[in-house]
């Protein structure tokens, strides 16, 4: 596996790739888990070359503490990527991605950008879309692999690719879950054993509910010791975000299936 720690190194590697080769790209913020691994395996099965990026993007964090406590396990991540036979790891610095600071940003005007996560985390989607645009301009992949867990993010990236005429196909992969139903997330690494017990109780409640009375469901979730930030039905999906201690988790799933594995 080739590791590029800056854009100049990456461009040298990218330019050496045979143009006829199909390139798959999996953007991550590190702290890799089986959800990321499923994306990478999908990319490996459909492309000649797979690029994975690790960059914890500061502009998409509206809470400084969340940014500072985001899990960092670079050496372990490198071992995971090497074991998966990833071709290129792109691991840029903040200075690489924002050489002159955060002077230009994508500001989404879509309705989906201003509800749920957009309402709860002002500026999050702007920062996310800005860095994704930069990463796509750098990597120039044929295929981009995203997880369904970040459903709003996926919808906005689809619009980004369309509006900016980016010749990249987006492949959306199913959310990977623990047996309890809890979606895999890098932030799960910050959960204590007690927190995990609370999460398991929440997902037991969610699996048994028919989502006809969200106020009652809110009370049930809060009774576990968690703090529900929002739960909402949108089309045929349920969206929710909640805190367990200081750890914020999000999820979405089809109303008919619930959070099934």
From Swiss-Prot:
GO terms for cellular component: cytosol. ATP binds at residues 29-36, 147-150, 184-187. It is found in: Cytoplasm. One of its GO terms (biological process) is pantothenate biosynthetic process. Catalyzes the condensation of pantoate with beta-alanine in an ATP-dependent reaction via a pantoyl-adenylate intermediate. NCBIfam families: cyt_tran_rel (TIGR00125), panC (TIGR00018). This is Pantothenate synthetase.
């Amino acid at each position: 596996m080739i590791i590029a720690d800056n854009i100049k190194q990456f461009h040298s590697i990218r330019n050496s790739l045979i143009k006829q080769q199909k390139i798959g790209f999996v953007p991550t913020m590190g702290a890799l888990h089986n959800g990321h691994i499923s994306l990478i395996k999908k990319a490996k099965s459909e492309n000649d070359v797979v690029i994975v990026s690790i960059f914890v993007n500061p502009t998409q964090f509206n809470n400084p503490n969340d940014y500072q406590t985001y899990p960092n396990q670079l050496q372990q991540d490198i071992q995971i990527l090497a074991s998966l036979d990833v071709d290129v790891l792109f691991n840029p610095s903040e200075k690489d991605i924002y050489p002159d600071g955060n002077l230009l940003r994508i500001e989404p005007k879509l309705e989906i950008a201003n509800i749920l996560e957009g309402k709860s985390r002002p500026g999050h989607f702007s920062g996310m879309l800005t860095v994704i645009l930069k990463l796509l301009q750098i990597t120039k992949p044929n295929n981009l692999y995203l997880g369904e867990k970040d459903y709003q993010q996926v919808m906005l990236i689809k619009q980004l690719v369309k509006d900016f005429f980016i010749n990249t196909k987006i492949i959306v992969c199913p959310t990977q879950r623990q047996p309890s139903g809890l979606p895999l997330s890098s932030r799960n690494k910050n959960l204590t054993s007690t927190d995990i017990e609370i999460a398991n109780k929440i997902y037991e409640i969610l699996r048994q509910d028919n989502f006809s009375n969200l106020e009652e469901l809110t009370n049930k979730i809060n009774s576990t010791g968690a703090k529900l930030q929002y739960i909402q039905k949108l089309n045929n999906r349920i969206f929710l975000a909640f805190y367990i201690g200081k750890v914020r988790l999000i999820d979405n799933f089809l109303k008919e299936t619930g959070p099934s594995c």
